[in-house]
Amino acid sequence: MAAKIIDGKTIAQQVRSEVAQKVQARVAAGLRAPGLAVVLVGSNPASQIYVASKRKACDEVGFVSHSYDLPETTSEAELLALIDTLNADNTIDGILVQLPLPAGIDNVKVLERIAPDKDVDGFHPYNVGRLCQRAPRLRPCTPRGIVTLLERYNIDTYGLNAVVIGASNIVGRPMSMELLLAGCTTTVTHRFTKDLRHHVEHADLLIVAVGKPGFIPGEWIKEGAIVIDVGINRLENGKVVGDVVFDEAAARASYITPVPGGVGPMTVATLIENTLQACIEYHDPQGK
């Protein structure tokens, strides 16, 4: 079978358009537009690209974007002080600190300093805990974006045998919680997993997030499986590929996400959704 392509670019644009309409309605009703503060420390080229795409998305949907570009020499205390200021600012609904941070700054301490109701990345232990307890508030962006893709393609996840490859805090672990909420029987594999092929071959829904090009051969994919490839890997020739061997997998799967243009755009779209949610539900409820 030839897999149907899950077009993340188109779905992400739909999500952003829906948010833009809600923002326009808020402003027309005399309410403020949501505000998102994006903090970049240092000059990591990849981080600069990610931050630029997030700021552009903000502007497109009518948010008020607050940019904080700090030098590489910024101390942890200075960064924490900025977060305290942003936490206290009633015009800011979301705070995003771009990772990775320079050496000498504790990522965990910084992420935990962000007020949970402004944690639009969904990384704060409070928000992760809420997701674990089946009462989510702000949800981690990439896992939530993947669930949105499945929903928009009317894929019924109840009862599916789901396998997540990779157990990172950003994707793998929260993804497993989202899949449990979506009614899947969920397995998470990691570097100590024995017989990875066996797990992949029995997956009705496979989500791969390891950051290694071509890590999963197409021949491992179960006939008719749904394949979600979170990997974004740039080869020496400049080509961007995922963690799954795409052409081989697409010949066996029923649905598959391409790289690029699959999961990536949904991460930013979900960040935008989370910021609107934070504004309406936690900071400016009269806008409901």
Curated annotation (Swiss-Prot):
InterPro entries: Aminoacid_DH-like_N_sf, NAD(P)-bd_dom_sf, THF_DH/CycHdrlase, THF_DH/CycHdrlase_cat_dom, THF_DH/CycHdrlase_CS, THF_DH/CycHdrlase_NAD-bd_dom. Keywords: Amino-acid biosynthesis, Histidine biosynthesis, Hydrolase, Methionine biosynthesis, Multifunctional enzyme, NADP, One-carbon metabolism, Oxidoreductase, Purine biosynthesis. The keyword Zinc-finger does not apply. GO terms for biological process: L-histidine biosynthetic process; methionine biosynthetic process; purine nucleotide biosynthetic process; tetrahydrofolate interconversion. It catalyses: (6R)-5,10-methylene-5,6,7,8-tetrahydrofolate + NADP(+) = (6R)-5,10-methenyltetrahydrofolate + NADPH; (6R)-5,10-methenyltetrahydrofolate + H2O = (6R)-10-formyltetrahydrofolate + H(+). Its EC number is 1.5.1.5, 3.5.4.9. GO terms for cellular component: cytosol. NADP(+) binds at G166, A167, S168, I232. It comes from the Bacteria. Pathway: One-carbon metabolism; tetrahydrofolate interconversion. Signal peptide: none annotated. GO terms for molecular function: methenyltetrahydrofolate cyclohydrolase activity; methylenetetrahydrofolate dehydrogenase (NADP+) activity. Catalyzes the oxidation of 5,10-methylenetetrahydrofolate to 5,10-methenyltetrahydrofolate and then the hydrolysis of 5,10-methenyltetrahydrofolate to 10-formyltetrahydrofolate. Belongs to the tetrahydrofolate dehydrogenase/cyclohydrolase family. Homodimer. This is Bifunctional protein FolD. It comes from Salmonella typhi. The gene is folD.
